[in-house]
Each structure stands twice: as C-alpha cells, then as structure tokens.
C-alpha cells in the first residue's frame, strides 16, 4: 500500500512538473485522504491543470500571477480561499469589472461550455496551487455553488 502512495505521488509530481512554471513541490497535497480520495484528487489536479492552460492561463498567466491590474492574480487568492462558490460562478458565467486602480473594464469571459466536472477540476487545481490550500472541490459542490449564481 505504501508503494501505491509513492507511485501516486511520483506520477503526480512528474506530470505536474512537465512544462510547468510552477514548482510541483509547492503544490498543496492534503494528507488526510484515503487512497481512493488521493487518486481522485490527483486526477482532478492533473486534468484541472490541462483545463486551466486551455481556458484561463491566457489572462491569469501560467504562473497564476495575472496581468497588471487587468486580470487578478490567483496566488493566495482570497476569493478562492474565502468564497469558492463565487469563483465557480465566475468561471461558468464570467463577469465585467473595473480593473484595480484604473478606469479600464476587464472581462472574464463566460465558460458555459465547461461541465461541472471540468469546473471542479479547475478549482481543485488553482485552489491548491500558488499558495492556495482549499483541498478537493467535488462536482457536487460545484453543482450547489452554481444553483446560487446569477448569470451576468
């Protein structure tokens, strides 16, 4: 069983480290999961990273640092940490907000084509990268979050 954990961690760090600007050893990995939960968590992290690169990194950057005052950084994000439901709504329905300290408006495009599973995977990835430590975000959680959303 310990060999399974070692293999699982090795696979996670190998895949997460490929072509990444983030040091995989800095990713948060909860230690209170059973073996099945750990496997599911790693799957969500890996798929979430792929989805993040395809859907989010153009604005938020591969490093999660965002872009100037237009696109917020995801590093130690208070929105992710304190209001994961709001983050799920932003991914699904997008928003238009004033940029920090500027007269510019920034647009976060709606990603209505993403399934609840894909949103859960993205949230699990970004929520456990760059200093964030929110743990596993399930599809059921995303479904509950989206019920309370008001599409923009």
Which ranges hold each PLM region?
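N-terminal hydrophobic targeting signals that begin at the initiator methionine
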Residues: 1-2, 19
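C-terminal motif of bacterial Sec signal peptides marking the signal peptidase cleavage site
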Residues: 15-17
């Amino acid at each position: 069983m310990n060999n399974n954990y070692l293999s699982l961690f090795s696979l996670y760090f190998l895949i997460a480290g490929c072509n990444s600007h983030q040091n995989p050893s800095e990713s948060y990995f909860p230690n209170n999961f059973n073996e099945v939960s750990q496997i599911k968590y790693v799957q969500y992290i890996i798929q979430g990273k792929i989805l993040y690169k395809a859907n989010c990194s153009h604005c938020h950057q591969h490093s999660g640092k965002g872009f100037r005052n237009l696109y917020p950084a995801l590093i130690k994000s208070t929105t992710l940490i304190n209001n994961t439901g709001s983050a799920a709504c932003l991914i699904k329905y997008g928003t238009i907000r004033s940029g920090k300290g500027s007269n510019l408006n920034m647009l976060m495009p709606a990603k209505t084509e993403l399934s609840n599973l894909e949103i859960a995977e993205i949230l699990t990835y970004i929520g456990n990268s760059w200093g964030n430590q929110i743990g596993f975000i399930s599809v059921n959680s995303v479904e509950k979050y989206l019920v309370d959303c008001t599409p923009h």
